[in-house]
């Protein structure tokens, strides 16, 4: 969220952060956004009878603020097909792994346990299934022998802070095109550079 707000401060950035919304009234991100001059709102899921009632309250807020695109960041509740289909191709998420690998939680621990040599993050359009949907962009890093879940997670987070604003910029500029399950238009010059050792 911080990276998106910071990017949107640039005069030539094509998107505006109109609202930061959380289901947790005490979420630290709300205070950060408020200090940055962004409108904030909390919709506490605990006071609603079910997910659909909760999401309809969110929908009213989004319509009130004339929201065009939703960027999920640390939102840990599964959304219903009703909400997702209502925001089809207008709802994106960032996930701390190279999807389709490591859907769900504890991605860094699982990557290390499997001994993978490449890890990273993915921005994708949201589908009703968890961590599914057309992949927009990915950033990859090498996994070091000395990595722990914390060190690996910190380096992936650095990539997230670069990748998410880049993707939002491309969407707001109407640069991306969806063709089946592929997203086209994330040109090679935007791709993360993965440095690998040279072999003799």
Stretch-by-stretch model annotation:
Residues 1-28:
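N-terminal Rossmann-like dinucleotide-binding module
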Residues 7, 23, 73-186:
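Donor/substrate-binding cores of folate-linked one-carbon enzymes
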Residues 22-23, 47, 51-52, 65-81:
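N-terminal glycine-rich "phosphate-gripper" loop used for MgATP/nucleotide binding
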Residues 39, 68, 117:
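Residue-level detector of anion-binding/catalytic polar loops
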Residues 41-46, 94:
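Short beta->alpha connector loops at strand-helix junctions that form conserved
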Residues 180-200:
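Short, basic/aromatic-enriched C-terminal tail that caps enzymatic domains
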Residues 27-39:
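N-terminal beta-loop-helix "entrance" segment that forms/cooperates
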Residues 52-59:
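Charged helix-capping and loop-helix junction motifs
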């Amino acid at each position: 969220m911080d990276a998106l707000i910071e990017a949107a401060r640039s005069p030539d950035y094509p998107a505006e952060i109109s609202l930061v919304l959380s289901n947790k009234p005490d979420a630290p991100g709300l205070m950060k956004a408020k200090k940055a001059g962004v409108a904030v709102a909390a919709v506490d899921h605990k006071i609603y009878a079910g997910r659909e009632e909760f999401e309809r309250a969110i929908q009213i807020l989004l319509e009130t603020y004339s929201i065009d695109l939703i960027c999920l960041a640390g939102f840990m509740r599964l959304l219903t097909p009703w909400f997702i289909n209502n925001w089809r191709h207008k709802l994106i998420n960032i996930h701390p792994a190279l999807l389709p690998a490591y859907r769900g939680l504890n991605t860094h621990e699982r990557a290390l346990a499997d001994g993978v040599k490449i890890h990273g993050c993915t921005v994708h359009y949201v589908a009703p299934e968890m961590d599914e949907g057309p992949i927009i962009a990915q950033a990859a890093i090498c996994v070091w022998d000395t990595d722990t879940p914390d060190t690996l997670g910190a380096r992936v987070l650095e990539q997230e802070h670069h990748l998410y604003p880049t993707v939002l910029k491309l969407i707001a500029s109407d640069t991306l095109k969806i063709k089946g399950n592929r997203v086209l238009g994330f040109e090679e010059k935007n791709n993360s550079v993965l440095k690998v050792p040279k072999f003799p």
